[in-house]
Amino acid sequence: MTVQRSGPPVETQKTEKSIYLLLALTTALWGSLYTANKFLLEAVPSFTLLCLRYLLSAAAMTAFQCFRKPDPQGKPRHIRGSDWKYVVLFGLGGYVLSIGLQQYGTKLAGASLASLINCMNPIVICFFAVLLLHECMTVKKVVCIASAVFGAVCIVGGDAGSGHLLGIVLSFASVLTWSLISVFMRSFTQKYDALTVTTCGIYVAAVATLPLMLHELATTPGVDFLHPKYILVLLYVAVCCTAVPHSLWNYSLSRVEASTCSLFYPVQPLTSMVLGVLLLHEHMTVGYLMGGALIVFGVLYSTLGKEKQA
């Protein structure tokens, strides 16, 4: 795949602010996924949950595709046959392999340590963006990343402890996979409509995880997720934690630099922290407050601060 160095024309300030809001919403919705998954995994095996999430998400996105207007930039919705291999790569690499590694990494290393490793995403995305897309690293981006990542460390680092070595390796592999896919997605969505690429990628993921779901259902007795409370949360996960944020993430990647998108990633643990306190009655610590303040500062500075070349 040829990585395009140049992106679209520089966005107006008003458009940039709108995209920043979309990025904040995207990462906040992903942050709520941790709380929802914690509830669903009590009744649904992990790959069954993943497959149902993708199947429902694909259905929702297909319905939306039928009623949406054409892309304002005129990008095609029909993907050429020679480019489908990249869509399969996005689906298998970004939505199956990366998430699967994250799930098993969390299981082996522990949730706190896995979350701490996941905070490396902005750094790795910026590294690949500079290396492959030749994006410029500015002083503002460095300050934002340092502030946000250190804030995320404050939130989850206190309880990280020591984890299984394989779990740590799998968690790092998940970060590398997702970051690399995000950078390639930035290049690919310069050519095709972002929502179409997302929809097709999620269909690939749904098909790929279907055999895993069938195996889990055949080997796991007593699986019952048809209770209304599970169905409602599953629909929330499929639409609000998958279809909407994945589409917004890929759309944002098509409009602004990948390294800029990565600055909003630490909003995830901040959202997870707030929901954990409000819904799961988790204890609020000084580290939580410090981390939250640093993340908010990083996000605000990324949207309001002036650029300086590093």
Predicted stretch roles:
Residues 15-20, 43-47, 51, 79-84, ...:
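Juxtamembrane helix-entry segments on the extracytoplasmic side of multipass membrane proteins
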Residues 2-51, 160-187, 207-209, 310:
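Glycine-/small-residue-enriched transmembrane alpha-helix faces in small-molecule transporters
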